[in-house]
Amino acid sequence: MGSKKLTVGSDSHRLSKSSFSSNKSSHSATKDQPIDTDDIDEDDESGHNIILNIISQLRPGCDLTRITLPTFILEKKSMLERVTNQLQFPEFLLQAHSEKDPLKRFLYVMKWYLAGWHIAPKAVKKPLNPVLGEYFTAYWDLPNKQQAYYISEQTSHHPPECAYFYMIPESSIRVDGVVIPKSRFLGNSSAAMMDGSTVLQFLDIKDGNGKPEKYVLTQPNVYVRGILFGKMRIELGDHMIIKSPNFQADIEFKTKGYVFGTYDAIEGTVKDYDGNAYYEISGKWNDVMYLKDLKQPRSSPKVFLDTHKESPLRPKVRPLSEQGEYESRKLWKKVTDALAVRNHPVATEEKFQIEDHQRQLAKKRIEDGVEFHPKLFRRSKPGEDLDYCIYKNIPVDEDPEKQIRSILQIAPILPGQQFTDKFFIPAFEKIKSQKKMIENEKQNPAKQ
């Protein structure tokens, strides 16, 4: 539909056409391209000794979520913002939405979901753990003159869980998801077992039951190798599952063996629910991926996705001066500023201050018998796919302009938007007031 955007964004925030490999680190920089400290591997002898001291107190299989790690392995980004890495290739979603053939549409969705995994620091870094109630919003000015909107919030701390919402209203595309990383110590490795899933819907494409076509997608797990001996590096491992009403893909992220194998390889098959195989996918998730048409047995695999040739479209975020104290970039600013100049003592102290404040708040909630409630997401109802969903009801068949207004009422997303008193009310209270308003409108239709 491509209606006029509600605000004019800043210059295009595009990354260069380069693959963010998990096993490469470069300290070189030019006058126009300064060093990004997220790309610097600071695993020197003293750093390794710090990690060894922490690890020596652990047993294999124990939970790492309560362990304080040194700041030199932290990325200058909260997990709430890190999720947007998966949303930086909207062109594949738009192509999927316009594709009439269900199998081809499935392949575009698979390409979209595979495209973002290579966006990561070149050094071994982990995102900042969001604090309870932390939130992050962003938007994209798309090439088709439409806008995409993103809202996320840390809904639980033990276990850590963040919920997110993404929508392109004018193209009837909606994404909801939760991320539940469960960290484990495995000897010379640590693992983040990525529970949770992503739910993609094309709201104007109906399945056999007349409901929006839905895709449910899971994540591979993340492993950090070499934490006791050898060089530290990140691997993705285990299986990613993508399911639609008609097809499913099981893609294995293969970890390298001690002797044989290679790093970063993937291997998978696209099938229908009768077991008929249509395509095989292979290659490397941070390099080039190939697709082989199994209905053409003599054909060779063709390039499916070359990560070196794709330019991610980075999200845009409101200025810091407009952000709330629990908004990710503002909350962690002193920490990320210190990390940017590699001042780890200051980063450690600022991080401690934030986390200690959270401990005091948690203690007070226990003393007062008060339960934490998210502001932007609600607990799911029976039968829903995720633990949490955005609290505001956005009707599937509503006019896109009304959908946009509803989204912008949830939280400030665009530059110039102001916080309202309603923003700070827990989501479940907002839902109650919504129901009362709807009931009043039904009882007094003349006042609408």
Swiss-Prot record:
PROSITE patterns: OSBP (PS01013). Residues 54-391 are annotated as: OSBP-related domain (ORD). It comes from the Eukaryota. It is found in: Cytoplasm; Cell membrane; Endoplasmic reticulum membrane. Residues 1-42 are annotated as: Disordered. A 1,2-diacyl-sn-glycero-3-phospho-(1D-myo-inositol 4-phosphate) binds at residues 64-69, 126-129, 157-158, 351, 355, 359. InterPro entries: OSBP_sf, Oxysterol-bd, Oxysterol-bd_CS. Changing H158A: Does not affect binding to phosphatidylserine. Changing L69F: Does not affect binding to phosphatidylserine. One of its GO terms (molecular function) is phosphatidic acid binding. GO terms for biological process: endocytosis; exocytosis; maintenance of cell polarity; phospholipid transport; piecemeal microautophagy of the nucleus; sterol homeostasis; sterol metabolic process; sterol transport. Its main location: cytoplasm. The modification Phosphoserine is found at S16. Changing T71P: Abolished binding to phosphatidylserine. It catalyses: a 1,2-diacyl-sn-glycero-3-phospho-L-serine(in) = a 1,2-diacyl-sn-glycero-3-phospho-L-serine(out). Changing K182A: Does not affect binding to phosphatidylserine. A 1,2-diacyl-sn-glycero-3-phospho-L-serine binds at L64, T65, R66, I67, T68, L69, N129, S183. Keywords: Cell membrane, Cytoplasm, Endoplasmic reticulum, Lipid transport, Lipid-binding, Membrane, Phosphoprotein, Transport. Interacts with the AAA ATPase VPS4; regulates OSH6 membrane association. VPS4 is required for membrane dissociation of OSH6. Belongs to the OSBP family. PANTHER family: OXYSTEROL-BINDING PROTEIN (PTHR10972:SF102), OXYSTEROL-BINDING PROTEIN-RELATED (PTHR10972). Lipid transport protein (LTP) involved in non-vesicular transfer of lipids between membranes. Functions in phosphoinositide-coupled directional transport of various lipids by carrying the lipid molecule in a hydrophobic pocket and transferring it between membranes through the cytosol. Involved in maintenance of intracellular sterol distribution and homeostasis. Catalyzes the lipid countertransport between the endoplasmic reticulum (ER) and the plasma membrane (PM). Present with 2550 molecules/cell in log phase SD medium. This is Oxysterol-binding protein homolog 6. The gene is OSH6.
